[in-house]
Design a protein with these regions (language model features):
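Catalytic alpha-helical scaffold of carbohydrate-active enzymes acting on polysaccharides/glycoconjugates
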Residues: 2-156
Length: 156
């Protein structure tokens, strides 16, 4: 078998790289970023990982729904307590269904990253027209709700 190389960049060992410092001479940067997602109930992607190949179930939908209803609020409280900024990869559908989350992100002044309309679809299997439509819908929704376009993108 012929081994293929990506040819995007040459190999470089850490021991041979130049020293890099972050602003203000800092040696370490940490990015706190999490996904805030919305799934279509019982349709689309979102299978139960305990049953590979099985269709979506009420149980795995509930795991995800818990995050928006309960889990995220504990996370916001912890971030506030530790005075840590965060970035949020957010599905556009969350903005329509969970307006309280928008208010908390705005109050904290956190960064918003586009993450598709829902996580019931996959960007990597879309044709160009569908992908462009999804990116535009997501960007427009984030801009409408936050007053500015997303700072970045993480495909669903």
């Amino acid at each position: 078998m012929e081994i293929q190389h990506h040819n995007r960049y040459p190999f470089s060992a850490l021991t041979e790289r130049p020293v890099y410092d972050w602003p203000e001479g800092k040696r370490l940067a940490v990015c706190l970023c999490h996904n805030i997602e919305w799934f279509s109930f019982m349709t689309g992607l979102g299978s139960d990982h305990t049953l590979p190949g099985a269709p979506q179930t009420t149980r795995n939908y509930a795991w995800r729904d818990y995050g928006n209803r309960v889990g995220i609020w504990y996370l916001f409280d912890l971030l506030d307590e530790l005075r840590l900024p965060a970035s949020h990869n957010i599905n556009a559908a969350v903005l329509e269904h969970c307006p309280q989350i928008i208010k908390r992100i705005q109050a904290r002044g956190d960064e918003v990253i586009g993450h598709g309309v829902t996580n019931s679809e996959r960007q990597d299997i879309m044709d160009e027209v569908a992908e462009r439509t999804m990116i535009t819908q997501t960007t427009d929704s984030i801009t409408k709700h936050f007053g500015a376009p997303p700072k970045g993108w993480l495909g669903p």
